[in-house]
Amino acid sequence: MNLEHIVELRVRYDECDPMGFAHHANYMKYFEIARTDLYRARGGSYRDFEASGLFVVVANIQCRYHMPARYDDLLKIAVKIDRITEAKIEQSYIVLREDTKIASGEATLAVVDRDGKLQRIPDILRDPLEGP
């Protein structure tokens, strides 16, 4: 599987620490923005998915920081679906400023019901992520 999606965003002032660097916690938010935009771009709707009583949760996430991003930098966040199994979705991320790698990471996602019980990944989530 090699489905990839890219989102552009600008580092906002409120995301920066006193040194003017994007605070490290924001990268998880950047990953989530790319992840949800990928699903939307493929015709999916998290709102509709959650209305069915199922939720996508992050089971594991990692981020490696290569270079600092600064206030007003224009970043590209690429998310790639690496693998989908019956119970999890594995994704990888790269954050770029022009051609400079700023950060990279991986996440493992799972689906749970309202009680937090692990569920198989349903077609409503799988189909947009596996389609052509």
Please provide the spans of the model-predicted regions:
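Hot-dog-fold acyl-thioester-processing enzymes
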Residues: 2-58, 114-132
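HotDog/MaoC-like acyl-thioester-processing domains
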Residues: 3-7, 40, 70-74, 82-132
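Generic structural detector for well-ordered beta-strands
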Residues: 8-12, 64, 108
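Exposed loop/turn and edge beta-strand positions of beta-sandwich/beta-sheet ligand-binding modules
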Residues: 52, 59, 75, 89
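Short glycine/proline-centered loop/turn elements that form peptide/ligand docking sites
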Residues: 43-45, 57-66, 80-87
